[in-house]
Regions:
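Bacterial N-terminal signal peptides that target proteins for export
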Residues: 1-13
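Sec/Tat signal peptide C-region and signal peptidase I cleavage site
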Residues: 22-28
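N-terminal mature ectodomain segment of secretory-pathway/periplasmic proteins
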Residues: 30-116, 153
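Short, ordered beta-strand-loop transition motifs
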Residues: 74-81, 156-164, 223-225
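Gly/Pro-enriched, hydrophobic low-complexity segments
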Residues: 99-101, 109-113, 119-123, 128-145, ...
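Surface-exposed beta-loop interaction hotspot
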Residues: 146-151
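Short, solvent-exposed mixed-charge patches
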Residues: 269-270
Length: 270
């Protein structure tokens, strides 16, 4: 081998060794807002149907159970999720139904049908902080919040529920959003692997801890698009001692869910 060729060969080996010696740059962590945007995407399914048992426990540890059927479907290229909840039992709530149009960039539309009155009532934005059918969940808690209505900050990473989680503080950008939600701040523990909320803390308008959300039994329902849903959600009111649990069963990924389910006409069917 000639000297120039030998020098080139040695230089190539040296550069290769240096490249191996330098550790690869670690991928930058996503921003807090990016994480919450991913959470929003991850919970959306093209369509789904489920049976839900809602258990409401008061401060004296007395519980009431309600059986619900639920269906969801995406519209407008995924920018709108429509949901319907229909109460099957007990008798005092049988036939009550709730229809939600959950929009990505504007205030949601919510209607509730009360069979005793044979009347459908629209729930306005200022009522979103009200209790969902006597539970510790509000109507707003069950909806997907508009991402641009909030500021986001990641405080740390820590384990929760068997998952390594990002811990993210979420604060409303305006008084109107805060009043509509009923919270001055929320803190979420978000799984780094599944991008689902594992835990949430909700603070009232005075900054005092109001409620804690804990989720579990996370299921992969759409493997192709990596869409997850918690089968268990528990909301604990830290100020009055009440708690409510949603346990989902018979959950199916169903893109062909009927469009007629998501109409006020269907809402009023017995």
């Amino acid at each position: 081998m000639s000297r120039p060729a030998l020098n080139t060969f040695i230089s190539s080996i040296t550069l290769g060794a240096l490249a191996l010696a330098v550790p690869p740059a670690q991928a930058a962590e996503p921003s807090a807002k990016d994480i919450m945007e991913k959470v929003t995407v991850t919970r959306k399914l093209d369509g789904s149907e489920a049976v839900v048992k809602m258990t409401v426990t008061d401060d004296k540890k007395q519980s009431r159970e309600r059986d619900i059927t639920m269906a969801t479907k995406l519209y407008d290229g995924g920018k709108t999720e429509k949901r319907i909840y229909r109460f099957l039992s007990p008798a005092d709530v049988q036939g009550t139904s709730v229809l939600v149009f959950d929009y990505e960039t504007k205030s949601d539309d919510v209607w509730i049908y009360l069979p005793a009155l044979r009347k459908t009532r629209r729930i306005v934005s200022s009522q979103k902080s009200q209790s969902f059918m006597g539970s510790e969940f509000s109507y707003g808690d069950l909806n997907i919040p508009a991402i641009d209505d909030f500021d986001y900050a990641m405080s740390k990473q820590e384990p929760f529920g068997g998952e390594t989680c990002y811990v993210i503080d979420v604060t409303p950008k305006s008084k109107d959003v805060a009043e509509s939600e009923g919270y001055s701040k929320k803190t979420y523990w978000v799984s780094k692997d599944k991008f689902t909320v594992m835990r949430g803390l909700f603070y009232d308008k005075d900054g005092k801890l109001l409620k804690e959300l804990v989720t579990g039994n996370i299921k992969l329902l759409d493997a192709k698009n990596k869409r997850y849903r918690p089968m268990h959600m528990e909301m604990i009111n830290k100020q009055n001692g009440r708690r409510s649990v949603f346990d989902s069963s018979k959950v199916t990924f169903a893109p062909s869910t009927k469009d007629e389910y998501f109409t006020t006409a269907y809402l009023e069917r017995s």
